[in-house]
Amino acid sequence: MLKEISPAPFGHFEMASPDEGADALRTIVLRAPGIEVHVSPFGATITRILVPDRDGVVADVALGYDDLESYDSAVDRPYFGAVVGRVANRIANARFEVRDENGSVVTRSDALVANNGPHCLHGGTRGFDRHWWAVASRSEDGTRCRLTRVSPDKEEGFPGACAAAVEYGVRADAVSGGACLHTTMTATVDAACPVNLAQHTYFNLAGHGASASDGENKRVDATAHVLRVDASRVAVVDRSCIPTGVLMDVKGTPFDFTAPRAIGASMPPVERPDDPGGFDHNFALNGAFPPESAASAEGAAKGAAETDVSLATDSLKLKRRRSLRVAAEAFEPRSGRRMVLECDAPGVQLYTGNFLNGQKGKGGAVYGKHAGFCLETQHFPDCVNQPKFESCVLSPGETYEHRMVHTFFAE
């Protein structure tokens, strides 16, 4: 079972005591009025998010496991609650090469670990999600913690060392009346390398196990949630979910969540026997791009079916901090729970748990297809190989930063 870490000075912090063995999964518990979040240093993983419904009944709305062995499985990898990297999402053909304006190679790798067919997914077989992170600090009031790890040169085939940090914090928002989970991810490198970290929590706002009927209550899965995404375009992908470089206007398509819409009423049609159905698509967030891309937004507004545009920016613009803005919000009618997601990333991947297939989760819950959904804020998939997309290549002396806020309400 998960074990709460009792308050102790960091530096005297033990991940697992000898009598508990290597399979112990301890968690840091963060608390603020209206919210409790459990974080495991293994994978910097969010294992629980407890928030009340409209009647004040508290439930855990994050899918996950009770034991370390399940989180560390090499066979079954849903990435429940983990920070994924060094590069989230897919890198086509597990290779990349980046050249500067003079044609000189900035960085390259032909030896990334291919763990999704021929492609590299979420950093490889043992990405950031399958390593212990050090607990660098925890606030005395129990509302914040900071986790760090150093990914060595050539880990999963990536060039150079990458020092990463994740800070989680919780607070009550007196202005909105909601309860907030703040996440900030940062990284530096000693050699030019793509960096694109994402937080991979699966949500079910009716409760993590609500997708299985209990005989009294109707099952509630991802399809029952009402979703709005502030994106008028979505990245077109091939059959292996690699972007083609084209952004499609969502108007009149299953991807149009510009107004609140039930996920189940919007599922794209299944076109192939090997298509699992559901969403696994990256949305281009409105207002995320610099003025150069304004023409693309204008083209989409005119109703163009597909807009082949460049979202590439130079290094200075890439490192310029964006403001937080609302990217998406989800509402679950039975519980009355609403979640608003703010971020500073250019895109958000909507994934509806298409490959969940009966994983045994916390408290005996069984997670079938569409048991939960992810809203993974990030750079575009395969952007390191897509010259029309904003680059995620980080150089020595630069700092990568990715911020998001999840605010929970009951109404």
Per-region residue spans from a language model:
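An exposed, glycine/acidic-rich loop-and-rim segment of catalytic or binding clefts
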Residues: L2-E411
